[in-house]
Regions:
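Catalytic phosphate/metal-binding cores of nucleic-acid and nucleotide-processing enzymes, i.e., regions
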Residues: 1-92
Length: 92
């Protein structure tokens, strides 16, 4: 039987970060990936609105031969979130 797409995605993410996918039951964590220092939650959807934004930024960045990075913040919250494609992470 073929692996569910979300399980395969969790395995890819785990491998990328050097962790192991957690089964639903019997693990010490509720994270999707067991890792020594990171709490990794994986979300696979048909479409994420933030990725639609990232696609638009990527098109403009390519025209300038630059690496696309999206920074997100919420009013009144300190700091910000950084969205970078896994293929581009080593370029930063």
């Amino acid at each position: 039987m073929a692996d569910k797409a979300w399980k395969a995605f969790e395995r890819r993410a785990a491998a990328y970060f050097g962790g192991v996918r957690c089964p639903v039951l019997g693990d010490d964590t509720k994270a999707d990936v067991n890792h020594e220092t990171l709490y990794i939650e994986c979300k696979q959807r048909k479409k994420h609105s933030v990725i639609t934004l990232w696609d638009s930024v990527r098109q403009r960045a390519r025209k300038e031969e630059k690496t696309p990075v999206v920074c997100l913040s919420e009013k009144g919250r300190p700091g910000f979130w950084i969205l970078v494609h896994s293929d581009d992470l080593t370029k930063l």
